[in-house]
Structures are given as C-alpha cells and as structure tokens.
C-alpha cells in the first residue's frame, strides 16, 4: 500500500467525521430552532413564560392527569394537567405514563355516552366530550407540542346567536364555574370547541376573561398538537333553570338550584363590565317596550305605547336589539318600572330589572303561555322579586300568519295540504319536543295586533305598581329549634298527656320575620303513621291519642312565612 492511498483513506475518515459532526450540529440547531419557534408560539398565546424543555419532559414523564367532580356525565367537570389536542385529528389526547391519574377511571363506561357534557345543556348528543388515549412514548412520533401556559376553561357554547342561550347556557354558567374552582379566575382563557364562528354576541363573552377567547378554528393556526398545562373541561350546570324540550316538552328544570340572589350578583358583574351604574334614586318611572323588526311584530306598537303611557302615567321607551347597543338596553332596563315584550330571547334582559319591577310577556295566537316559561321561571326565582304577567292573543282576527315563508320562519307550504289546513284551524299548539315542530313555528312567528284594553286589564289585575322591594333576608331559612324537652303525665290508667317545649332557632333573634310557626310530628314507636301539628307557641300539651305506658318519637321544626321550612331538630324520645 503506497503512502498516497493511506493518506487519502485518512483524509476521507477525517472528512466523514467532520461532516458527521456538522450534520449533528445542524440537526441540533434545527431542534433548538424548532423549540424556540414552539416557545414563541406559546408566548403568542400568553405572556406567561414557559421552559419548553421542562414542559416537554414533564409531559413525557408524567403524562396526562385527570380528576373530575360529579358522578354522572351530566354533572361532571374535569380538571386536567397536560391534556392535549390534535388540530389535525380534532381529538383531545390523554397521554399515559406511569405517573398518569384518571379519576374516575370508568373504562368502557366513559363511552356510555360520554365522559361529560361540554355545554351546560343536559345530555345533548352534540355536546359530548371524550378523548383518545396514547402512551406517552408516542410523542416521539408526533408533531412537537405547543404548550398553552394559561389555565384553560374548555367548553361549548350552545347557541351563540341567541341572547337567551348566551346568558342561560353560557355566560352565567361560565361565571359560576370560575367561582367554583380555585385555579380559575378572570386571567384564565376560554376555549370554545363547538365549531361556531364568533356569533352576534361575542363581545359579551369577552367580559368573562381578561384574555381573548379562542375558537376551535383558530387553534389550527397555533400548532398541530396543543397541550394545555392546566385545564378545566365542562361547565357547572347549577345555575340553569330551564330545559328546552329535547326529551320531554320544554319547561322549568325539575330540580332548580339557583336563586335570584345569584342571578342578581351576576347581573351586577355584567353591569360593571358595561360601565353602567345603577341609579338608586331614579327620578322618573318609565316603561320599556322591546320592539322587534323582523318577525313576531306588534302591529299596533305606537298605539300600545301611547295607551301604556296614558294608563300608567309613565313615560314609555322603545328599545330593540337591532337599533340599540346592548349597554344602552341594559342601562334603560336596569331602572325601568315595567318591561313589555313579545315572547323571545330579548326577554333574558329582564334579569337586569330592579326588584319590584313588572315583566309583561306577550304571546301570539295559539301559543299557550303556560307551555313556554323560561322568563316566568326566571322572574319567580326566590330573590328575583319581579312581578310577572303573561298575556296571550286569543282573537284569531288579530293575528297575521306567514304560511309562505321558509319553514324555519314559520312557513308551512312544504307540508301536504291536509296538514296545512289542520295547522291553520288549530286553536292551540299542543305540547311538543324541540325544535322543528311546524305548528309551533307557524304560530310563534305570527305578528300580533294587541288588544290593548285586554292587556291593560291583565296587568292591573296581576301586579301592584310601586310595590315594596323586599330584602333578601325574606328568603333566609330558620335553623333548628333548641333545647327541646318532653314531659309525660298520666291521668289514671286510660289517659296520658305529653308536654313538649323548645327554644327558638338561634338565627331567629337576628332576623325580622313576619310569621313564625312550628311544626311538630308525634309518632308512636313502631308505627308508620304520625300526627302533625302546626303551632304558634313554643310549648304545647298534647292529649289527643296519647296513651299511657307508650314510647313516642317527637320531631320539631320551625317555619318562616309559611314556606321556608327549617330542619327538624334531633328526635325526642318520650315515655308516658
């Protein structure tokens, strides 16, 4: 072998080593550049700085962690660490490692039908949330994640173009979900995953966070794999009061858990965001009439305005969602004496009315007010203290229908002639499910000539103008009665008496309560029935059906104002 060949071989080896080192340095440079870009993308989302390498290592080693509250998918909200979302697959991803936590660990029950509802609407099959599962090792074969450093609230808006749905389904539940979990506050970021665009009322959603809410479509611009360092998924439903008729005809929820106190607290928050100061000493009483411009019109609106002003000796003001800013509408309603409106989403603004105000809801011909009560239910929540009146047009000649419109605006020409005639002759829409019942749509989109004398008579008979605005203490419940005692006395062998006494509940001495009563149950031990008594005093001697040599169980509770039932005190065991 000549020296030239040896030299060439050595040179090739050196060149290969240098080239390999250069390639490795280039690869490392690209990795660093990619990580810097991913860090930059994270910084675009939030001002919170993130150590990308540490975040990636934590994701690989710890995987995803989940702890949920609630027993069923309909009442569950879940807290996640390192929940990820693939914008390509449009799927949430749970990465498993030896350190992962999944509570509850439901196995296949997670798909029956879902882990949770993404919106506050119960058990709607378009609102279900779930995730797919992967081992954390799969991250090696996936796009590098972009980390979201903000605490995220991930949810669906149910119908962001309808003001009633915006408030009832979204804004109020968001507000109280934030109150419920310590990690959530107004520095958290909202992620709307239902797929809608911003919608008509997006500015209202911005009040719920100091950071811009993000839509599902916008996530694709942030990266192929997003990982939320900390997130909450789902909404608390504790503030909702109405169900929309997906399973049974619409009506108030069976178990309403919210009061007017919470609704008014939310209203105060919103008014602050709208820069509205409530005028506690408004000099002039006035009536607000909601005007509609597209459908469900009041055809004699000007005449109605004049009649209301003359009858109640108040100024009347018209507002509309089309011609007034939302802030202006709330500013007017928050000091109004009366709000008059056709049935519709705009009536959700009644939650801004002052206590004692009157809500007048008008219904077209054939639409029974007792079947459609979201605003009646709101008005009559304990603590709302609004006076509610429903008026229905019962005169067919005072209605204008539009059978030739598209079906979604109440048209019925797409139906066969027999069905069209049946609907036209019908006097009342039967109870029905949501949401495309043609008879309901035909009637609800009618225009109405209001019988003014009939309406005024209904308002005057069911309300009291200038009614005293009660204080929230009227809705406070009594505590347990204290120091309950019983003493028996025998009257020969066949008769006995039972003297029972107790002290007032501890909280009663701090309250001004108009009516205080006590309910006493007496049950002979071993029997299923009991004898109930309602008493005004704090002691009583019972003789009716009291037998000697018998053991009686006695329960006592306090009642405020006939409806506020306190808890029973510990049972008394009394022997005659």
From Swiss-Prot:
Cytoplasmic topological segments: 1-4
Main location as per UniProt: endoplasmic reticulum
Glycosylation sites: 98, 275, 335, 451, 539, 561
EC number(s) per entry: 2.4.1.312
The protein's name in its UniProt record: Protein O-linked-mannose beta-1,4-N-acetylglucosaminyltransferase 2
Protein location: Endoplasmic reticulum membrane
Lumenal topological domain: 26-576
Membrane topology listed for this record: Single-pass type II membrane protein
Catalytic activity: 3-O-(alpha-D-mannosyl)-L-threonyl-[protein] + UDP-N-acetyl-alpha-D-glucosamine = 3-O-(N-acetyl-beta-D-glucosaminyl-(1->4)-alpha-D-mannosyl)-L-threonyl-[protein] + UDP + H(+)
Record function comment: O-linked mannose beta-1,4-N-acetylglucosaminyltransferase that transfers UDP-N-acetyl-D-glucosamine to the 4-position of the mannose to generate N-acetyl-D-glucosamine-beta-1,4-O-D-mannosylprotein. Involved in the biosynthesis of the phosphorylated O-mannosyl trisaccharide (N-acetylgalactosamine-beta-3-N-acetylglucosamine-beta-4-(phosphate-6-)mannose), a carbohydrate structure present in alpha-dystroglycan (DAG1), which is required for binding laminin G-like domain-containing extracellular proteins with high affinity.
Cellular component terms (Gene Ontology): endoplasmic reticulum; endoplasmic reticulum membrane
Pathway terms, separated by semicolons: Protein modification; protein glycosylation
UniProt KW keywords: Endoplasmic reticulum, Glycoprotein, Glycosyltransferase, Membrane, Signal-anchor, Transferase, Transmembrane, Transmembrane helix
Residue intervals of the Fibronectin type-III domain: 482-576
């Amino acid at each position: 072998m000549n020296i030239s060949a040896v030299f060439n071989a050595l040179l090739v080896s050196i060149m290969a080593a240098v080239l390999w080192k250069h390639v490795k340095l280039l690869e490392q440079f690209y990795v660093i550049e990619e990580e810097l870009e991913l860090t930059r993308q994270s910084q675009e989302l939030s001002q919170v700085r993130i150590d990308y390498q540490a975040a990636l290592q934590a994701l690989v080693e710890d995987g995803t962690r989940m702890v949920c509250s609630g027993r069923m998918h309909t009442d569950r909200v879940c807290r996640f660490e390192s929940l990820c979302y693939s914008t390509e697959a449009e799927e949430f991803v749970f990465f498993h490692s030896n350190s992962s936590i999944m509570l509850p660990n439901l196995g296949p029950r997670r798909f029956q039908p879902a882990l949770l509802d993404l919106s506050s609407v119960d058990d709607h099959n378009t609102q279900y949330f779930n995730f797919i599962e992967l081992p954390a090792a799969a991250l090696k074969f996936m796009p590098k994640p972009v980390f979201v450093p903000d605490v995220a609230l991930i949810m669906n808006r149910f119908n962001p173009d309808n003001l009633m749905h915006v408030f009832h389904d979204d804004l109020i539940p968001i507000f109280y979900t934030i109150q419920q979990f310590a990690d959530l506050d107004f520095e958290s970021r909202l992620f709307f995953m239902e797929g809608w665009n911003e919608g008509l009322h997006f500015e209202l959603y911005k009040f719920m966070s100091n950071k811009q809410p993000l839509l599902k479509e916008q996530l694709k611009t942030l990266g192929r794999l997003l990982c939320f360092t900390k997130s909450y998924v789902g909404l608390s439903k504790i503030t909702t009061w109405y169900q929309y008729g997906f399973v049974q005809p619409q009506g108030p929820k069976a178990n309403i858990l919210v009061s007017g106190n919470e609704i008014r607290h939310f209203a105060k928050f919103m008014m602050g965001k709208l820069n509205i100061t409530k005028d506690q000493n408004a000099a002039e009483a006035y009536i607000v009439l909601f005007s509609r411009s597209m459908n469900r019109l009041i055809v004699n609106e000007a005449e109605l305005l004049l009649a209301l002003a003359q009858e109640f000796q108040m100024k009347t003001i018209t507002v509309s969602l089309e011609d007034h800013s939302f802030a202006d509408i709330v500013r007017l309603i928050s000091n109004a004496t009366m709000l008059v409106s056709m049935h519709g989403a705009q009536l959700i603004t009644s939650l801004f009315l002052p206590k004692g105000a009157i809500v007048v809801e008008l219904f077209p011909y054939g639409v029974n007010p007792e079947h459609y009560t979201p605003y009646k239910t709101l008005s009559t929540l304990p603590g709302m203290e609004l006076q509610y009146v429903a008026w229905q047009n019962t005169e067919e000649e005072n209605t204008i229908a539009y059978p030739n419109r598209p079906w979604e605006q109440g048209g019925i020409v797409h139906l066969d002639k027999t069905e069209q005639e049946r609907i036209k002759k019908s006097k009342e829409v039967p109870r029905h499910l949501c949401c495309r019942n043609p008879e309901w749509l035909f009637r609800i989109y009618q225009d109405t000539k209001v019988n003014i004398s009939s309406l005024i008579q209904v308002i005057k008979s069911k309300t009291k103008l200038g009614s005293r605005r009660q204080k929230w203490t009227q809705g406070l419940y009594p505590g347990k009665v204290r120091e309950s005692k019983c003493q028996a006395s025998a009257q020969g062998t066949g008769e006995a008496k039972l003297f029972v006494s107790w002290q007032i509940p501890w909280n009663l001495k701090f309250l001004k309560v108009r009516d205080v009563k006590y309910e006493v149950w007496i049950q002979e031990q071993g029997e299923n029935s009991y004898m109930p008594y309602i008493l005004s005093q704090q002691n009583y001697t019972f003789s009716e059906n009291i037998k000697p040599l018998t053991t009686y169980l006695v329960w006592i509770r306090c009642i405020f104002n006939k409806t506020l039932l306190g808890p029973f005190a510990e049972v008394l065991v009394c022997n005659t």
